[in-house]
């Protein structure tokens, strides 16, 4: 425990005391007004009641904030909005949007200064670089194949928002700012129920989006900080035998002796022998913990995480939120894919002098399969096909122009291919493309009271071009001089697009 506390104190950021005075600067709220709420209209914003608010209200609001009686009355009478000097309710809407946005911008300053305060000669830790979403796909393609067990974790979130405020006390020691944050959270009674909703932690209200995102990211940063400590403690040397182990002990002692005589000379060489038992990647409120070792060791990891949330974050996590599976015998849901790591046999032909023999080599390969049943269910719900996948027309779109109908169907098809381009078996994607293309043809034929064949002959190649995906367009440019070129067999390799992590729901382009 002492080692953990020392590690925690060593890596904590510098405490900040200057945050609260910035809350009374006008430009902070002007910045929140211009960039946080409505980028297209920097001068004024429009509320849900079609009422416009000018940035001039910022100065009046800051003047009221200097008055102590205003804050006392607001706390004593939370149901009565003391910002309302007028009967039209301008300040109530403005207060609920601009002030939390400005507060979020101010409290983000210490975290941004921590990044710029690092000396140039100091290398950024690799673990921080791997927090990007770009690390997800190399993780699956490379390290994932050499691991044995998988823990699929649904990252919990605090039941009470006071826990989030307490987490900020480790990094921001500006007491007035923390009290003001508590005032915001208590003022809006629906915030606590909103953030603990089981639907999604990412679906924030527009006016509170920045503040909630900051609170949630600060919680994730603190959770991953402790997880990094456990990960470093679980590292071990990759051993081949007991003899190798003894040799490496002697070698490590020699390296330590040389490290004392020549400090910093062999530092990078020692890290070469470190082999973490656990690999971690996070996405969309979930996390994957893939590790080596036995089933018992991975169950201990599960209880490590449960105790971590219980003792350091003061809330209980249900054990069922952490699913432990063996990679060789199970599949898991990942970003809309059904993924698994089966063992496949590779037949290798070897020849030594005049002798020819075959060797069976077992190797692991990541399979990412498109969930056909779920996607066909989405298309059926959107009235593009029946439950069994039979294409039908969409009568609600018959009032649109022909090119609008083609554009909508083509955009849906391209979005599906774009999202699931990392699939190792794309037969399901071509089936979905067939359903959308025939549904489009039937919709157009129904609009013009004609047959499908007649209408497709009238459109010709323009009808097919609307359903070309990004992969097909790129490959068609690369192989323009090739006479025999087939889209179906030319790009079986998986293609990962880094922007698919932003797509939360595939049903959105279907509506």
Swiss-Prot record:
Pfam families: Intron_maturas2, MatK_N
Top-level taxon: Eukaryota
Keywords assigned by UniProt, alphabetized: Chloroplast, mRNA processing, Plastid, RNA-binding, tRNA processing
GO biological process, one term: mRNA processing
One Gene Ontology molecular-function label: RNA binding
Locations listed in the record: Plastid, Chloroplast
One GO CC term on file: chloroplast
Coiled-coil segments: none
PANTHER family, A to Z: MATURASE K
Family statement drawn from the similarity comment of this UniProt entry: Belongs to the intron maturase 2 family. MatK subfamily.
Record's function text: Usually encoded in the trnK tRNA gene intron. Probably assists in splicing its own and other chloroplast group II introns.
Name used for this protein in its record: Maturase K
